[in-house]
Amino acid sequence: MDIWPEFQRDLEMYRDVVLSIKRNLRLYEECIESLVHQIGSTNFDNAQPLFDDLFRMQSELATMLYKYEYKPGKRIQDLIYHLDRDDFYSRKYWHKKFSDGLAWPE
C-alpha cells in the first residue's frame, strides 16, 4: 500500500495552512500595536471604539486558543490573558497604562 502521495498532499496542505495562520497572527499583532498606540494617544472617552476593536480581537484570539487549540507565541498568549476582562475599570486601567507608554499588554 502506497500511502506517501496522499500523506505528502496532507503535509503540503498543513504547511500552507500553518503559514497562513502565522501571517494572520502577524496582522493581528500589527493591528493591536496600532490600537494600543491610538488608545494611548487619545482621551478615555474617544478611546472607547478603539477598546471595542481591541477586545473583539482579544476574543477572536481567545477562540483560536481555547476552541481550536492553536497555541500562539507568548506575546499573543499574554494579550489573551491580560485582556480577558472587559469592563469600565479594566478599560480605565489599560488606558492609563497605554497613555504612560506601554506598547503591549503585559
Curated annotation (Swiss-Prot):
Which residue ranges run through the membrane?
none
The family database entries (InterPro entries) matched by this protein are listed as: CdiI-like
Q: Which cysteines are joined by disulfide bonds?
A: none
Domain of life of the organism encoding this protein: Bacteria
Q: CDD domains from the entry? A: CdiI_NC101
Q: How does it assemble?
A: Forms a contact-dependent growth inhibition complex of CdiA-CT-NC101, CdiI-NC101 and EF-Tu; the complex is a dimer of heterotrimers.
Relate the protein's function as given in its record: Immunity protein component of a toxin-immunity protein module, which functions as a cellular contact-dependent growth inhibition (CDI) system. CDI modules allow bacteria to communicate with and inhibit the growth of closely related neighboring bacteria in a contact-dependent fashion. Neutralizes the toxic activity of cognate toxin CdiA-NC101 (the C-terminal 154 residue CT fragment). Does not inhibit toxic activity of CdiA from other toxin-immunity modules or strains of E.coli.
This protein's name = Immunity protein CdiI
Q: By which gene is this protein encoded?
A: cdiI
